[in-house]
Amino acid sequence: MSRVALVTGGSRGIGAAISIALKAAGYKVAASYAGNDDAAKPFKAETGIAVYKWDVSSYEACVEGIAKVEADLGPIDVLVNNAGITKDAMFHKMTPDQWNAVINTNLTGLFNMTHPVWSGMRDRSFGRIVNISSINGQKGQMGQANYSAAKAGDLGFTKALAQEGAAKGITVNAICPGYIGTEMVRAIPEKVLNERIIPQIPVGRLGEPDEIARIVVFLASDEAGFITGSTISANGGQFFV
């Protein structure tokens, strides 16, 4: 029987690449999204991947959404916490709403999504959780105190939960992408990309969403069962921990 994978923020950008790669690897895949129907509908039509709409910042919405996925596809074996938002501002101009929105989605969202699937993974003695953090959770980024704090929190969550899951066959790992060539990044003016961003990256290029997706597929596999609590940096050498 095929294992079931759920990817949050799974219909666009890195999340879409992850969803597609997991399906190609033989998983039954569900992709959740929060609000972009214009992206989700063609994604479903083009890939055949089931899409579900809910906001990961709401625990109740996550419980309800996960129940729908499991009713349709079966118990979730692989959870990829990819959903995230930005509300950038210099700290002296940042509002409580900007802070809370990012923390609630990018950090609390991991609790909201993982908690409802955790008991089932424990009962089945198998689970794979992959948290998509960020290079900015490792090094910080000016104008992103909220985002950097949330993504750093994702790494602490990963390490703590890995210790709890290890004896039950559950691995918990994180990936910290650097600049990846998503639609959002490629919308940055070419002059800025070529003169300010790419020179920071020793390999001399942006990463590709598929490169992140391939890491996820490996971490979700049986072959990665001895890897847990790890953070994989995928940033072209831009930052070393």
UniProtKB/Swiss-Prot annotation:
GO terms for molecular function: acetoacetyl-CoA reductase activity. Its EC number is 1.1.1.36. CDD domains: BKR_SDR_c (cd05333). The active site is at 147 (proton acceptor). Substrate binds at residues 88, 141-144, 178-179. NADP(+) binds at residues 12-14, 82-86, 177-180. It catalyses: a (3R)-3-hydroxyacyl-CoA + NADP(+) = a 3-oxoacyl-CoA + NADPH + H(+). Gene3D superfamilies: NAD(P)-binding Rossmann-like Domain. Pathway: Biopolymer metabolism; poly-(R)-3-hydroxybutanoate biosynthesis. Keywords: Cytoplasm, NADP, Oxidoreductase, PHB biosynthesis. It is an enzyme of class 1 (oxidoreductase). It holds the Pfam family adh_short_C2. Transmembrane segments: none annotated. It is found in: Cytoplasm. Its main location: cytoplasm. Coiled coil: none annotated. GO terms for biological process: lipid metabolic process; monocarboxylic acid metabolic process; poly-hydroxybutyrate biosynthetic process. GO terms for cellular component: cytoplasm. Belongs to the short-chain dehydrogenases/reductases (SDR) family. This is Acetoacetyl-CoA reductase. It comes from Shinella zoogloeoides (Crabtreella saccharophila). The lineage of its organism: Bacteria, Pseudomonadati, Pseudomonadota, Alphaproteobacteria, Hyphomicrobiales.
